[in-house]
Amino acid sequence: MAIYNKLLLIFTFFFLYSCSSSYEKLNNANFSPPDSFSKHLFDMYKEKANFEAEKMHDWNSAKLYSEKALEAAKGVKIQPENINYWKIPNEHQTQIKLAYDNLMSIYEPALIHDPYNLANAISSLDCWSEQQEENWQTWDINNCKDSFL
């Protein structure tokens, strides 16, 4: 039993460390994303990571948003998470899937013509999906959904 408890403690430590390392990197370094789309995405995902870590203490979501912000800082053309990534309740899947499909249909032209609103839509759809998966903070769900729309 003592070995089990020690292994559980070690596993917990490494799990928490892995969740917070990208968040710490995001907040302890300066970044200069190479283009306006990447800069908008970086700023929006960093804001979401900070909210999830500092206000909600949701380290899994903070990790996801931190990793996306760090990728955006490198100029990677971030897309929203595939809807299958999330465990969204059945009654909300159709609406979010439609939003995802619509966003992906305008992704390439929006990169050129409207990078700010594209970045907002991508980060808001991830936020909406993440909050809908949790399915209990209606204010947060509606806030993310309204930001997307």
What kind of feature is each model-predicted range?
Residues 19-149:
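Long, charged/polar, soluble alpha-helical segments
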Residues 3-10:
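Sec-dependent signal peptide recognition
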